[in-house]
Design a protein with these regions (language model features):
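Membrane-interface transmembrane helices that cradle and orient dolichyl/undecaprenyl
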Residues: 119, 156-173
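Transmembrane-helix signature of polytopic, membrane-embedded enzymes
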Residues: 94, 108-134
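Short acidic/glycine- and proline-prone juxtamembrane loop motifs at membrane-interface regions
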Residues: 140-151
């Protein structure tokens, strides 16, 4: 009975995750702490962290600029966190850790269902469920209050609905697909990679199956995902009565990635942020210097 196995996988992952987060009692740090501070304060009507010169975690790295002048895309997860803190209170990140646990369990369930969609064989899904039950790394990651897990979960289920559309041509399943992808990109902006993948698949489907509505959905996805992120940024800027810059760009990250890191090969270094802030958050000047370095 695969439905029983799927339910068992969800319950097992959720129980292990809940035991873990309540045993460890982790607290946020680094970017996670900045987002916690901002979300918990905005939930109480305080928008000071969005202004330059504000007192926030590791503020010395930002040369007096607001964290969100450098990384405005983080406001997507700030919005999600703020909603949670308005409902459950601002004293702890534990509500978001619980949501992380449920999202890991839901993501595992989504992977199992996608396996069934693609292969159509209970035996293969059974093997995948057993493998997922033994994969505890994402469960241990639930103490990290960031957008990774929520974004991953939403992207996996968006993939499930997109595959369902390809297999059934039922247009209504594109609605949850689009909504979940928007939430995924808000939680973790890196999940734009899913948008790219979805658009490519929809274009191929358009050409192969002559389903021209697929290309319309691809266009709608791009507008919804990118537009919602920009709308959230503008909303917070308006609420805080301030102006937020465009932030560190992909060109600066490319320059950063080509340089050595003080942490580990291929890992983070301060070059992208330093270029941006040293040019007074002028992205054109910063990118010009980055291209010269590249």
């Amino acid at each position: 009975n695969m439905k029983f196995m799927e339910a068992g996988l969800f319950a097992f992952s959720a129980i292990i995750g809940l035991v873990w987060i309540f045993s460890v009692q982790s607290i946020p740090a680094a970017d996670s702490y900045n987002i916690y501070e901002t979300a918990s304060q905005t939930a109480q009507g305080n928008y000071a962290f969005l202004h330059n010169g504000s007192d926030f975690y590791n503020k010395d790295f930002y040369s007096g600029f607001s964290y969100y002048n450098c990384y405005p895309f983080q406001l997507g997860f700030v919005l999600i966190s703020e909603i949670v803190y308005r409902i459950f209170g601002t004293d702890s990140t534990m509500p978001l850790q619980v949501i992380n646990v449920l999202c890991v369990a839901a993501a595992y369930l989504g992977i199992a269902k996608i396996t069934k969609q693609i292969f159509g064989r209970n035996k293969i899904e059974f093997i995948v469920i057993l493998a997922l039950a033994g994969c505890i790394q994402p469960v241990l990651f639930c103490t990290f209050v960031y957008g990774n897990i929520i974004g991953m979960c939403c992207a996996i289920w968006a993939s499930h609905f997109l595959i369902k559309y390809f297999q059934t041509d039922k247009y209504l399943v594109l609605i949850p697909c689009g909504v979940l992808l928007v939430v995924s990109a808000l939680a973790k902006y890196n999940n734009l990679i899913y948008l790219v993948a979805f658009v490519i698949m929809l274009i191929i489907h358009t050409v192969k199956a002559k389903k021209w509505q697929s290309i319309a959905f691809a266009l709608a996805l791009c507008i919804a995902v990118v537009g919602t992120s920009n709308l959230v940024i503008k909303s917070y800027a308006s609420r805080a009565n301030t102006e937020l810059k465009g932030g560190v760009s992909q060109v600066l990250y490319l320059d950063m990635g080509l340089n050595e890191s003080y942490m580990a090969p291929g890992w983070y270094n301060n070059i992208a942020l330093s270029l941006y802030t040293s040019n007074n958050c002028d992205i054109d000047a910063a990118e010009s210097q980055a291209w010269s370095d590249i």
